């Protein structure tokens, strides 16, 4: 077993490179995104929004066993030292928007959802539980089924779309609270990435209900950036302290 910044070997990519290139940054997908987001200290947390979502929190060099429905995992190893994370995965987040578009035919593109959510009646209390394939962390209920509640005669397309966006933020919030309870740490900022983070309504609602700053980077491929950072540190191109400061 090697550290994440170890030199694993070299490659020419089957002749693509004229000289062998060292392989010296190896990380899992979400773990690389955590590193790419600069979550290098205990208490720092990132959320990747995609078809499903992954939330990961750096907890430092001592593992913590969760009692609130998330799992403990390795973050990375550097110089013989291992950092750990709490991790929670959600089955249905961005996929809810696909359901609105492909199955319900309420929208023709994901971009429409922000405007519709802003048009929705703020007094409407429609809620969506997106348990189309059960519920993942922190609920772990494989038998749960999806439901929509609170519909009234005045509930329309905009209100249903808003409920779909809201349910993404509610699930992320439940994971944030679970991790705060497990660690006793107060999370100040949520660093986010993934396609749905371009939705201004969703990101503002996420910030409101978690009462956290939501930091949206300009870059989109945080996993690739994290792996590149790790390789660069191993090769002496990057300095970890400077990366952490930025």
What are these regions (language model features)?
Residues 11-246:
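Active-site core segments that coordinate phosphate-bearing ligands/cofactors
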Residues 6:
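Active-site-proximal segments of catalytic enzyme domains
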């Amino acid at each position: 077993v090697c550290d994440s910044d170890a030199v694993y070997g070299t490659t020419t990519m089957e002749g693509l490179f004229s000289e062998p290139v060292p392989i010296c940054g190896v990380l899992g997908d979400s773990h690389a995104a955590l590193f790419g987001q600069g979550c290098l200290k205990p208490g720092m947390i990132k959320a990747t929004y995609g078809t499903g979502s992954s939330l990961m929190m750096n907890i430092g060099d001592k593992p913590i066993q969760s009692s609130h429905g998330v799992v403990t995992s390795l973050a990375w190893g550097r110089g013989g030292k291992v950092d750990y994370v709490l991790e929670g995965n959600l089955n249905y987040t961005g996929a809810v928007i696909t359901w609105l578009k492909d199955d319900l035919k309420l929208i023709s593109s994901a971009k429409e959802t922000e405007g519709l959510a802003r048009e929705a009646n703020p007094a409407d209390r429609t809620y969506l539980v997106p348990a189309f394939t059960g519920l993942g962390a922190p609920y772990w209920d494989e038998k749960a089924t999806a439901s929509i509640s609170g519909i009234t005669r005045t509930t329309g397309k905009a209100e249903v779309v808003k409920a779909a966006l809201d349910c993404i933020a509610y699930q992320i919030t439940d994971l944030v609270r679970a991790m705060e309870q497990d660690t006793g740490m107060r999370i100040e900022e949520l660093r986010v990435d993934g396609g749905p983070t371009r939705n201004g309504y969703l990101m503002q609602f996420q910030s409101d209900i978690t009462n956290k700053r939501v930091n949206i980077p300009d870059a989109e491929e945080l996993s690739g950036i994290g792996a590149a950072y790790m390789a660069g540190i191993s090769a002496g191109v990057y300095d970890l302290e400077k990366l952490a400061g930025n």
